[in-house]
Curated annotation (Swiss-Prot):
NCBIfam families referenced in this protein's UniProt entry, alphabetically: PRK04115.1 (NF003153)
Protein name per Swiss-Prot or TrEMBL: UPF0216 protein AF_0460
Disulfide-bonded cysteines: none
Organism for this UniProt entry: Archaeoglobus fulgidus (strain ATCC 49558 / DSM 4304 / JCM 9628 / NBRC 100126 / VC-16)
Pfam families in the record: DUF61 (PF01886)
The family this protein is said to belong to: Belongs to the UPF0216 family.
Signal peptide segment: none
Length: 134
C-alpha cells in the first residue's frame, strides 16, 4: 500500500474529529452543548462531563481549555500508545486521573489506561489515529 492511500484511509477513520474545537467556558453556558464534526454531524457533549472537567481545571483556564480532549493513538515499534499533546489537556488528565508520564512535553498513556479516561469522558474526548510513515 502506498503512502497516499494509507493517508486517505487514516483521514477517513478520523472524519469524526471536530471541524472546530470549542472552549470549556463557552460550552458550560449552553443547555445542550454540541460540536460539529468534519463529517458534518453534530455531536452532543454531556454536561456532566464538562462539569467534571471544570472541577479539575482552573477557572481562569476555562476560556483556553478546548473541547474535545484529544487522545492521539500512535503505533510505536508495534506497541500502541496514546499521546496528549495539548498542555491544558495533559494537566487536566494528570489532576483528574493521576497519570503523569510526560516525555518531551507530551503526556504519554498506555492502552490499558485509556478505558478509565473514556469511561469518564465518553462524549468530551476523542481518539484520533496517527501513523508514522518513516
Amino acid at each position: 500500500m502506498d503512502e497516499k492511500t494509507l493517508a486517505k484511509m487514516i483521514e477517513a477513520v478520523n472524519k469524526h474529529m471536530p471541524e472546530k474545537t470549542r472552549s470549556l467556558a463557552e460550552m458550560l453556558k449552553e443547555k445542550d452543548p454540541t460540536i460539529r464534526a468534519k463529517d458534518g454531524n453534530e455531536y452532543y457533549i454531556e454536561k456532566r462531563e464538562l462539569e467534571f472537567i471544570a472541577q479539575h481545571v482552573d477557572e481562569l483556564d476555562w476560556p483556553r481549555f478546548r473541547i474535545p480532549v484529544i487522545l492521539e493513538m500512535n503505533d510505536i515499534g508495534g506497541e500502541r500508545v496514546i499521546y496528549v499533546r495539548d498542555k491544558l489537556h495533559a494537566e487536566f488528565i494528570k489532576r483528574a486521573f493521576g497519570f503523569d508520564r510526560v516525555l518531551n512535553g507530551i503526556l504519554t498513556l498506555y492502552m490499558y489506561e485509556l478505558p478509565q479516561i473514556r469511561r469518564k469522558l465518553r462524549t468530551a474526548s476523542q481518539v484520533i489515529f496517527r501513523i508514522s510513515l518513516k
